[in-house]
From Swiss-Prot:
EC numbers for this chain: 1.2.1.10
Enzyme category, top tier: oxidoreductase
The protein's name: Acetaldehyde dehydrogenase 2
Taxonomic lineage: Bacteria, Bacillati, Actinomycetota, Actinomycetes, Mycobacteriales
SMART domains tied to this protein: Semialdhyde_dh (SM00859)
Species assigned in the record: Mycobacterium ulcerans (strain Agy99)
């Protein structure tokens, strides 16, 4: 039985490089390849120095190798991943997708990871989704017996300098995808997502506000306890994820459409592996992807785990 699952990283940009440092610390995953298309990429150069086999010949090179990875983490673009996904499937390689392609089911570790451990391809949704859907899920499960959460709204504020051209070009896709995740994974009957690119200098870390409508007679202590439990779960893979204060409960009012509301404020500070600490929005994506890969390795790839 191998001690670790073999891993390839497809993409050699900032997110892939940050992901590499997280994977190198894993007891369950062994990064062995980094695949890019630019021979001058800094990410490929760093990976080579760290002992990985690298190529600028793309996914076709990877799937042509006799020794193939157990898992691929892809951080390229939706267009590239949609073209690559069938190649991974044909080669028998499991894929963890950090792009908006959504070829496979979206996964948020505290909420639905166990449901998709056998999926050949899973998607990491969005940074806003990874940061806020766990809270919506926590509230939804606490009020499930009373009809659940009729409406949830999340506002994600990220440092403008941490948002690359892909994010800026796909704001509408971000809001649509995150809103859907608030409903299908978080459990709200209707969801809404807003992203704010904060231009502050020096940059501010990611901050998120999560509004959940709740039944007026809901057990508020149970809701707060559920939120704290889920926050603790996220902190096992994102130590910089934290509540800014206790969940705030408001009575029904005209402003809330006649519904009681619980409001939760969180912030996400990155680990600073490669990306700066203020880029918690990117860090939570690479950390959550690592968590998903580790759980897949533990549960379905027959590896024993262990230190290097």
């Amino acid at each position: 039985m191998p001690s670790k699952a073999s891993v390839a990283i497809v993409g050699s940009g900032n997110i892939s490089t940050d992901l590499l440092y997280k994977l190198l610390r894993s007891d369950w995953l062994e990064p062995r390849w980094m695949v890019g298309i630019d021979p001058q990429s800094e990410g490929l150069a760093r990976a080579r120095k760290l002992g990985l086999e690298t190529t600028h010949e793309g996914v076709d090179w990877l799937v042509a190798q006799s020794d193939k990875p157990d898992l691929v983490f892809e951080a390229t673009s939706a267009y590239v991943h949609k073209a690559a996904a069938p190649k991974y499937a044909a080669a028998g390689i499991r894929a963890i997708d950090l792009t908006p392609a959504a070829v496979g089911p979206a996964v948020v570790p505290p909420a639905n990871l166990r449901e998709h451990l056998d999926a050949p391809n899973v998607n990491m949704i969005t940074c806003g989704g990874q940061a806020t859907i766990p809270i919506v899920y926590a509230v939804s499960r606490a009020v499930a017996d009373l009809g659940g959460v009729p409406y949830a709204e999340i506002v994600a504020s990220v440092a403008s300098v941490s948002a690359g051209p892909g994010t800026r070009a796909n704001i509408d896709e971000f809001t649509k995808t995150t809103s859907k995740g608030v409903e299908t994974i978080g459990g709200a009957r209707r969801g809404k997502a807003i992203i704010i690119l904060n231009p502050a200098d020096p940059p501010m870390i990611m901050r998120d506000t999560i509004f959940c409508a709740i039944p007026e007679d809901a057990d508020r202590d149970a809701i707060a306890a559920s939120i704290h439990e889920v926050v603790a779960q996220v902190q096992t893979y994102v130590p910089g994820y934290r509540l800014l204060n206790e969940p705030q409960f408001d009575e029904p009012s005209i402003n809330s459409g006649g519904q009681a509301v619980v409001t939760t404020f969180v912030e996400v500070e990155g680990a600073g592996d490669y990306l700066p600490p203020y880029a918690g929005n990117l860090d939570i994506m690479t950390a959550a992807a690592t968590k998903v890969g580790e759980e897949i390795a533990k549960e379905t790839l027959a590896v024993s785990g262990g230190k290097r």
